[in-house]
Swiss-Prot record:
Disulfide bonds: none annotated. It comes from Cereibacter sphaeroides (strain KD131 / KCTC 12085) (Rhodobacter sphaeroides). InterPro entries: Exonuc_VII_L, Exonuc_VII_lsu_C, OB-fold_nuc-bd_dom. GO terms for molecular function: exodeoxyribonuclease VII activity; nucleic acid binding. NCBIfam families: xseA. Its EC number is 3.1.11.6. This is Exodeoxyribonuclease 7 large subunit. The gene is xseA.
Length: 519
């Protein structure tokens, strides 16, 4: 009965391990059996604690694997892990004895093909668009003639040369270049820092603050342009207080910075064309406006002169204003004299029969009274006529006083417009005279530079470094065979030429026969 309660004897062929020993053995087997591996899967449950390490899961439809990326390596990953992203992780397998699970230590990570990148790009675009970073209301107009243009691009390569060349051809401007990496892990932080750095420049500081920014890069694959799809770059472009043109890739390439920028250019050259107008077209337009201004000024002066003439003709002459009352005065004066004579004669005829009955004194009194009445009426008539003439004169003077300021203002405005137009035309003429001289000076400098380049690249500079030119019959000899067939060779050195004739060809000395062996 006691055997039922005793432990069976352990098998002699089965080794015994502690938990730690077995976990360590499993760890050594996994790490030794699997070296550097690449695992494809979907990212899930991403965790970023304060330590800076990165913890996440790699899963497919049948299994889940824990993944760790240490702090030092997490900052160098080319792709920022996000939940739901399909990636290919490169790392080494290991185990964590504390939880009895296996895991992969990730050293590098890449999206699993362009489809995964496009899916992640679309997800990021939708999230940023939901925040309003791509709204048309946020976009600002570009300045018409920017004094300073800031360019964020690589300092070497065709992009910056194309931009500078196009700006120089169209309208030379002050250009500030902020050199950045346009590809790789440093691209996004450097581009974002450059945009924010230009915006941080103070107005009126030692370094002029740009009026316009251009972020440019040449064409490339989706992976090459990925730095311009990073959230840090998009937010920097959207927060920029300086108008910004995005010129990343070719016309068919689209990045998220294109949506956040104020304008998108299909190529870096097109960005330079958007930034500034053509100077020669502006000068031609200025000449046209100057001619139009001259014509308008001449037409305005002609119209105002004609208006003055019309107003002068519409005014009545002084003689015509006084002629009517004067004629009526003369008429009534003539009639008054005749009427007085007739009245006196009639009254005399009527009074003569009565005179016999009147006493001289009464008659004298009556005549005196009539004479006084006649004098009063004469004076009253003269006063009335004088008042009418005075009113006519006052009316004429009032009309003249009302028209005089208008005439003076019209003449003063015409003189000011004429002086202003003359000054504008003088300035335009001076600028037009100076433009050909400046262009001629630039062309002369360019011609001198090309001549110096021609002299530097000429073969005579090569002769100074110890080389020589061999000619035969006036043609340059470039091979040994050509030199062997020529009768006379002419060798040109730095300080002159030397002719060399062919001598007799020596017959090669025959080698002595080999000495035989006596043995």
């Amino acid at each position: 009965m006691s055997d039922l309660f005793e432990d069976p004897a352990p098998s002699r062929n089965t080794p015994e391990f502690t938990v730690s020993e077995l976990s360590g053995a499993v760890k050594r087997v996994i790490e030794g059996e699997f070296g550097l591996v690449r695992v494809r899967g979907e990212i899930g449950r991403v965790s970023r604690p304060a330590s800076g390490h990165l913890y996440f899961d790699l899963k497919d439809d049948r299994a889940v694997m824990a993944a760790i990326c240490w702090k030092g390596q997490a900052g160098r990953l080319s792709v920022r892990p996000e939940e739901g992203m399909e990636v290919v992780a490169t790392g080494r397998m290991t185990t964590f004895p504390g939880q009895s699970k296996y895991q992969i230590i990730v050293e590098d990570m890449a999206p699993a093909g362009a489809g995964a990148l496009m899916a992640m790009l679309e997800k990021r675009r939708a999230a940023l668009a939901a925040e309003g970073l791509f709204d048309a209301a946020r976009k600002r107009p570009l300045p018409y003639l920017p004094r300073v243009i800031g360019v964020v691009t690589s300092p070497s390569g065709a992009v910056i040369r194309d931009i500078l060349h196009r700006l120089r051809d169209r309208f030379p401007s002050h250009v500030l270049i902020w050199p950045v990496a346009v590809q790789g892990e440093k691209c996004a932080p450097e581009v974002a820092a450059a945009i924010r750095g230009f915006n941080a420049l103070p107005e009126g500081g030692p370094i002029p603050r740009p009026d316009l920014l251009i972020v440019a890069r040449g064409g490339g694959s989706l992976e090459d342009l990925w730095g311009f799809n990073e959230e840090i770059v998009v937010r920097a472009a959207a927060e920029s207080r300086i108008p910004l043109i995005s010129a990343v890739g070719h016309e068919t390439d689209t990045t998220l910075i294109d949506h956040a920028a104020d304008r998108r250019a299909p190529t870096p050259t097109a960005a330079a064309e958007m930034a500034v107008p053509v100077r020669l077209e502006l000068l031609a337009g200025l000449d046209g406006q100057g001619a139009r201004l001259s014509r308008c000024a001449a037409e305005t002066i002609r119209r105002r002169d004609q208006r003055l003439r019309d107003l002068a003709r519409a005014l009545p002459r002084l003689e015509s204003l006084v002629a009517g009352p004067s004629q009526r005065f003369d008429l009534w004066s003539g009639r008054l004299s005749g009427a007085l004579g007739q009245s006196v004669a009639a009254r005399r005829a009527r009074l003569e029969p009565l005179g016999a009955h009147l006493r001289p004194r009464l008659l004298a009194d009556l005549v005196a009274r009539q004479k006084d009445r006649l004098g009063d009426r004469t004076r009253s008539l003269e006063t009335c006529l004088g008042r009418r003439a005075e009113r006519a004169r006052d009316r004429f003077e009032a009309l003249s006083a009302r028209l005089a300021p208008a005439f003076a203002r019209l003449i003063a405005e015409t003189e000011r417009a004429t002086r202003r137009d003359a000054a504008t035309l003088g300035t335009l003429a001076a600028r037009l005279d100076a433009a050909p001289e400046a262009r001629l000076a630039r062309l002369s400098d360019r011609l001198e530079a090309l001549d110096r380049l021609r002299q530097t690249l000429g073969y005579r500079e090569t002769l100074k470094r110890g080389y020589a030119v061999v000619r035969a019959d006036g043609a340059v000899v470039t091979t040994k065979a050509e030199a062997g067939t020529a009768a006379v060779l002419e060798i040109e050195f730095q300080d002159g030429r030397l002719s060399v004739g062919r001598g007799k060809t020596r017959k090669p000395k025959e080698e002595p026969p080999a000495q035989g062996s006596l043995l």
